[in-house]
């Protein structure tokens, strides 16, 4: 099901200009990752990061995440780009950051990984997509070995990003592990739970 993307109108000294909401947010260095992490989505996110990096490598990029996860290779393309560019990527979870969504949430710059109070974070081991594996025994063995290598690499990165031991990460990702925003902070997946900003006194 497709949704209508809202348009916003901005007044400039040259008259009115209309943007779709995501393009307008991009002007403020905000990227929104909403939905599954697919190759197409990853390409868009990477392209936006590279554009913002070229515009100003000293300014933070804000990546808002509300995602059930998705493709490992697509997610790793986003992860590697986040580490490659000079601009700090500030990650914020709104709603849900599950699986690869949680991995990208914790990949933000240290001290700049946040979640809203009612957000949920889910970590687990890498899954095989497509409803199962079929093929020759040797091909299944190749896929299984590859998945174990991917699992080991992702666990190592999670351990580095959270400060947890590899053994703890392996145990906690063996099955689905849901966390509240506060629990994710205690675990080291994020640095801060965002509360309402201070309101000016009347």
Curated annotation (Swiss-Prot):
The gene is clpP2. One of its GO terms (biological process) is protein quality control for misfolded or incompletely synthesized proteins. The keyword Hydrolase applies. It comes from the Bacteria. InterPro entries: ClpP, ClpP/crotonase-like_dom_sf, ClpP/TepA, ClpP_His_AS, ClpP_Ser_AS. One of its GO terms (molecular function) is serine-type endopeptidase activity. Coiled coil: none annotated. It comes from Desulfitobacterium hafniense (strain Y51). Keywords: Cytoplasm, Hydrolase, Protease, Serine protease. Cleaves peptides in various proteins in a process that requires ATP hydrolysis. Has a chymotrypsin-like activity. Plays a major role in the degradation of misfolded proteins. CDD domains: S14_ClpP_2 (cd07017). This is ATP-dependent Clp protease proteolytic subunit 2. The lineage of its organism: Bacteria, Bacillati, Bacillota, Clostridia, Eubacteriales.
């Amino acid at each position: 099901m497709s949704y209508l993307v809202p348009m916003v109108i901005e007044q400039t000294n040259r008259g009115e200009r209309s943007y779709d909401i995501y393009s307008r947010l991009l002007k403020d260095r905000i990227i929104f990752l909403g939905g599954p992490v697919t190759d197409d989505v990853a390409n868009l996110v990477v392209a936006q990061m590279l554009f913002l990096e070229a515009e100003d490598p000293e300014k933070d990029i804000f990546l808002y995440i509300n995602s059930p996860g998705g493709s490992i290779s697509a997610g790793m393309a986003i992860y590697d780009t986040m580490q490659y560019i000079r601009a700090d990527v500030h990650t914020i979870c709104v709603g849900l950051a599950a699986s690869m969504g949680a991995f990208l949430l914790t990949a933000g710059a240290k001290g700049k990984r946040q979640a809203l109070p009612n957000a949920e974070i889910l970590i687990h081991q890498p899954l095989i997509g497509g409803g199962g594996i079929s093929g020759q025994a040797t091909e299944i063995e190749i896929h299984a070995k590859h998945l174990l290598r991917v699992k080991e690499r992702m666990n190592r990165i999670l351990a580095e990003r959270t400060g947890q031991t590899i053994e703890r990460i392996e145990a906690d990702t063996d099955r689905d592990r849901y966390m509240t925003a506060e629990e994710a902070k205690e675990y080291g997946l994020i640095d801060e739970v965002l509360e309402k900003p201070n309101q000016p006194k009347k």
